[in-house]
Amino acid sequence: MSNPSGPIASMLNAQQAPDDRYQRFADLAPFVREAIDTIAALTPAQRVDVDFLEREFIPALGLNDELLHEQPPELAPSFGKGLHLWQYPNQLAPYLAWLARNAAGITSYMEIGCRWGGMFILVAEWLRTSGADLKRVIALDPIAPTPFIATYFELLQEQARIEPIYMQAFSTSPLVAAHVDRLKPDFVFIDGDHSLRGAMQDHLLVRAHASIIVHHDIHSRACPDTTWLWKALREFEAPSFDAFEFTNQYPSVNGSFLGIGAMKRRSAQA
């Protein structure tokens, strides 16, 4: 997460969350191991079964319970549970299926704006159980590691197969730029500063190294800058990247929200 601005700041800045919310995540930290086991237990067929992922797998992992006017009420039984994924299952499911088909060759995963860490954990584990030769995972956020992140990193350190790196900083920090140049992450999920300039800077930060760049909130009434930026990037990056969009909506929600946009460097296309 880079410097947030405007109304999106209160949504994204976990430093503003009350202490009881941190305690909730501390209480839920044991679920991290359960989630890892659940992901690892999936069969290859289940990993590309979009209907199964949408209706069973993702709701069971637990969904976000903030800004519920943006959330489909039919998913209420999953709100405020587990990994607290701030995603629509009908967007995340086809994205995960796509990722399962494109995980080969990925050695490092970076998330800009990891916040509580649920999505970071899901994607990192999804990659390493879907054929990626994952050697390093990098989480970036200006807040200190949350209970989810701390628990996950402890597990990775115990296993000693994947190097976990946490950078507590804004993505505009020169130190972050130096680390990116050194670590050269080849798959990056951008969900930090939702201003036009901030999201574009994050894209440029990783473009030279990443074979896959994914942007969040590309089809959201609440995030006009990132929505517009995705449309522009889709055109500007067309000579080098193929674009894939996951923007399904729920009729029960008034408006369009969230949205995942993935870009894969054409030279890396399978």
Language-model segment annotations:
Residues 1-87:
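Rossmann-like AdoMet
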